[in-house]
Design a protein with these regions (language model features):
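Generic structural signal for well-ordered, non-transmembrane alpha-helical segments
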Residues: 19-22, 262, 292, 299, ...
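Register-specific recognition of a single heptad position within extended alpha-helical repeats
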Residues: 8, 12-15, 255, 285, ...
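A short core secondary-structure module
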Residues: 164-205
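Glycine-rich phosphate/pyrophosphate-binding beta-alpha loops
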Residues: 166-171, 252-255, 374-377
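Glycine-rich flavin
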Residues: 43, 47-50, 57-164, 169
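Glycine-rich beta->alpha junctions and the first turn(s) of the following alpha-helix
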Residues: 211-304
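Glycine-rich phosphate/cofactor-binding loops in nucleotide/flavin-utilizing enzymes
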Residues: 355-394
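C-terminal helix-coil-helix/basic helical segment that borders enzyme active sites and/or dimer interfaces
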Residues: 33-36, 306-337, 350-358
Length: 394
């Protein structure tokens, strides 16, 4: 599907980023079905991204990256997701974390430079990935607030961490996790803290618990910390609740929503190709693309995608041009429309293709499962609707 220029890559840099993503997507697509079935991480595509510098896009230019903007990753991640959604999701989380930390300036320069330089220099294997590890069995979504059950106790010249983190996306291939914990220092009240924890830290282990409907290859297993010791310097500053960082988090979430847009685009491509090639005997050699009901469904697919991509990309471009806290509702709307329209596209594609879309070997069946994960990224629909209502009525 082709889009008018504002909704696709416009600058030479944007085109280059999309081409890097497509190079990895092409490799990853050949292995996506196997990794989905076996719940293994798509290392083949990740190796391409490590080699071509995609993993360091959001690192500042002064540290060897490209200072990529939200729009760059929206365009790149949607292209990457057409090959393998699980790979794209983990890479999107990595890039978004680096981007929002860079833009909001919430870490110390020493912390950020240490991570950034390793990210841009790791050009082989699985590269150097980072992700936020915040979810817990009893806590629910971290975006809803609450103090973690995971603890970090100040002891001597370091911290001792104990707890469990669920939804640890990319766990098998991460170099670091930013672990949220309740920090205990002496008799003082515990406070919410974040810790930059190397995944090689003794006392840290991964329980292979990830067995889900969709996004099966993300390796989002349970991380167990049992007397895991880190240096005193591992604590990274956490922004205050409701601070200036929040709009940056919302803005960079668009680069994650773009993954689900890309999955929907892959579902659309499969359905359109099927319609053009399917020639039942009853049609005397004509393809089903000539049937009015099929053409109606094809039109619905593209209408939904134009809506989703148009709002997502235009909102990202608006943010990059003039970041503002006043855009919170627009950012939420772009995410919600992208994730819900993506689900609608996958469902419409299955209706167009018919019963064969249910085959476990069909990429469309995988797209249908993967795309549903978009509902569970913040802001979830109910939080977005509450925001819209507050702005309209209060």
């Amino acid at each position: 599907m082709s889009y008018p220029a504002p909704f696709g890559p416009v600058t030479e840099r944007e085109r280059d980023i999309v081409q890097r993503a497509l190079a990895a997507a092409s490799v990853a697509a050949d292995h996506a079905g196997r990794h989905d079935r076996d719940r293994t991480f798509p290392v083949e595509g990740l190796a391409v991204l490590a080699g071509n510098g995609y993993l360091g896009l959001t690192v500042p230019g002064r540290l060897g990256g490209q200072s990529a903007r939200v729009t760059d990753l929206v365009l790149g991640n949607s292209a990457l997701a057409r090959g393998d959604a699980s790979l794209a999701l983990v890479v999107a989380m990595h890039g978004a974390l680096l981007g929002r930390v860079r833009d909001a300036g919430v870490w110390s320069e020493a912390h950020f430079e240490r991570v950034a330089r390793e990210v841009v220099s790791a050009r082989d294997g699985t590269g150097a990935l980072i992700n936020s590890l915040a979810s817990e069995p009893e806590m629910g979504s971290p975006s809803r607030g609450g103090l973690p059950r995971t603890t970090a106790v100040r002891r001597g010249r370091g911290w001792v961490l104990n707890g469990r983190k669920t939804f640890s996306s990319g766990a098998p291939v991460l170099r670091w996790g930013v672990v949220s914990a309740a920090a205990h220092v002496g008799e003082a009240e515990p406070y919410l803290a974040g810790f930059l924890v190397p995944m090689s830290t003794p006392g840290l282990r991964i329980e292979p618990t990830w067995d889900t409907l969709g996004m099966r290859a993300t390796g989002s297993h349970t991380l167990v910390l049992q007397d895991a010791e880190v240096d005193l310097s591992a604590e990274v500053p956490r922004p205050a609740a409701g601070g200036d960082h929040l709009p940056h988090e919302r803005a960079w979430s668009l680069s994650v929503a773009a993954v689900y847009l890309g999955v929907a685009e892959a579902a659309r491509e499969y359905a359109i190709r099927f319609a053009r090639e399917r020639r039942p005997l009853a049609l005397g050699g004509r393809s089903i693309a000539s049937l009015p009901n099929i053409r109606d469904r094809a039109g619905r697919l593209d209408l939904l995608l134009f809506q989703a991509r148009g709002l997502l990309v235009s909102t990202a471009r608006a943010w990059d041009a003039a970041p503002s806290a006043s855009m919170e509702a627009a950012l939420a709307a772009a995410k919600v429309v992208a994730s819900n329209n993506a689900i609608a596209v996958a469902e419409e594609a299955m209706r167009l293709v018919g019963g064969s879309s249910l085959d476990r070997g069909s990429p469309l069946e995988r797209h249908f499962r993967d795309v549903r994960g978009g509902l569970h990224h913040p802001p979830q629909d109910d939080a977005a609707l509450a925001l819209f209502a507050r702005e309209a009525l209060d």
